[in-house]
């Protein structure tokens, strides 16, 4: 995961001081890309421990189309707590847009099912895309989508994915985002009888919060360790039938975790 550490250093070296919605302040760069060959290992940051339970359960929650944090709480995941209302609702965030994008005539489009069908029946299509950025519903969302748009690509029997992330919290959020989409690529590839290819991450406003600087320097002082391997223990009937127990990360030997405040 040297690419990730190099991005951190780039933000420190080249970033512009900017104000932000949270009032915390950031160092920010605009436009950055990283490529991870998923054949080389699972891209889970090793210079600090990442909470894999949260990453897996959040992705399963998205795939169910859920937008209430009750499922997350049942599984001891609290990463969405700060944005939920008193009933645990977040509005039409990722899960709603992925699974039930509303159309003007009252229908709902299941984008995940659509891209699975495309991958199986028209893998050379240049339209194998999922978007969470629904302009008509942004004002109803507790938090506008940060990882907003992703595209799948099939070549030589391998499935690749590129994500566009409009806003990226490099220290806290990005390790989650990379691992989450890498996991999704593995799941989609298994469902489509493909091998995994590359995960390409593209960032817009890519920033370090001003209250994450000490943590960033600590992480940069650490040497990356070998990437772990993802094992999927079974192939469910559909992309929506995976369970937490289906996934195992083998050989994950990270440095200790580093705590940092969340900018809300």
From Swiss-Prot:
Keywords carried by this UniProt record: Cytoplasm, Formylation, Methyltransferase, Nucleotide biosynthesis, Repressor, RNA-binding, Transferase, Translation regulation
Broad class of where this protein is predominantly found: cytoplasm
GO biological process annotation, one example: methylation
Catalysed reactions, semicolon-separated: dUMP + (6R)-5,10-methylene-5,6,7,8-tetrahydrofolate = 7,8-dihydrofolate + dTMP
Outcome (variant: residue 126 to E): Shows 2000-fold decrease in catalytic activity and 600-fold decrease in affinity for dUMP
Pfam families the UniProt entry points to: Thymidylat_synt (PF00303)
Function of the protein: Catalyzes the reductive methylation of 2'-deoxyuridine-5'-monophosphate (dUMP) to 2'-deoxythymidine-5'-monophosphate (dTMP) while utilizing 5,10-methylenetetrahydrofolate (mTHF) as the methyl donor and reductant in the reaction, yielding dihydrofolate (DHF) as a by-product. This enzymatic reaction provides an intracellular de novo source of dTMP, an essential precursor for DNA biosynthesis. This protein also binds to its mRNA thus repressing its own translation.
Name of the protein: Thymidylate synthase
């Amino acid at each position: 995961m040297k690419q990730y550490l190099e991005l951190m250093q780039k933000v420190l070296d080249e970033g512009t001081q900017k104000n932000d919605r949270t009032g915390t302040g950031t160092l920010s760069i605009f436009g950055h890309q990283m490529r991870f060959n998923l054949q080389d290992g699972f891209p889970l940051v090793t210079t600090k421990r990442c909470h894999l339970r949260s990453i897996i359960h959040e992705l399963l929650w998205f795939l169910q189309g859920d937008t209430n944090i009750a499922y997350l709480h049942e599984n001891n995941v609290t990463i969405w707590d700060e944005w939920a209302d008193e009933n645990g609702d977040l509005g039409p965030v990722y899960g709603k847009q992925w699974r039930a994008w509303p159309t003007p005539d009252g229908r709902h489009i299941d984008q995940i099912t659509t891209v699975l069908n495309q991958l199986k029946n028209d893998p050379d299509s240049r339209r194998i895309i999922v978007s969470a950025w629904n302009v008509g519903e942004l004002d109803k969302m507790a938090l506008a989508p940060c990882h907003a748009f992703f595209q799948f690509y099939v070549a030589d029997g391998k499935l690749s994915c590129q994500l566009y992330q409009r806003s990226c919290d490099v220290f806290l959020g990005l390790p989650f985002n990379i691992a989450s989409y890498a996991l999704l690529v593995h799941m989609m590839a298994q469902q489509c009888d493909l091998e995994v290819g590359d995960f390409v991450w593209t960032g817009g406003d890519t920033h370090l919060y001003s209250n994450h600087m000490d943590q960033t320097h600590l992480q940069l002082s650490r040497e990356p360790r070998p990437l772990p391997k993802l094992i999927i223990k079974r192939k469910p009937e559909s992309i929506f039938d995976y369970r937490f127990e289906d996934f195992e990360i083998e050989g994950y030997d990270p440095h200790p975790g580093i705590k940092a405040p969340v900018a809300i």
